[in-house]
């Protein structure tokens, strides 16, 4: 049975808590969630570490995203991705 992603849309910008996603599919789930963003729309990712490998993957995408660190550790990193192109 499919599980819903741990996505909170209580705020004006949806948040995805990736800690709750199995590690094996985490990056794929994040890329899928980012694919739903139109130009000008944002999403916040909550990660258990600084996701540098993920940031490199996102930089290589056809779509472009502005990246803003909202919180940097020690237990969680909150990063806002805003689609720019």
Segments from the language model and where they lie:
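Positively charged, polar, low-complexity stretches
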Residues: 2-85
């Amino acid at each position: 049975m499919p599980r819903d992603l741990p996505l909170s849309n209580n705020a004006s910008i949806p948040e995805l808590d990736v800690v709750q996603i199995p590690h094996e599919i985490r990056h794929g789930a994040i890329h899928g969630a980012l694919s739903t963003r139109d130009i000008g729309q944002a999403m916040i990712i909550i990660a258990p570490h600084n996701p540098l490998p993920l940031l490199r993957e996102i930089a290589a995408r056809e779509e472009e995203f502005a990246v803003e660190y909202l919180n940097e550790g020690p237990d969680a990193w909150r990063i806002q991705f805003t689609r720019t192109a």
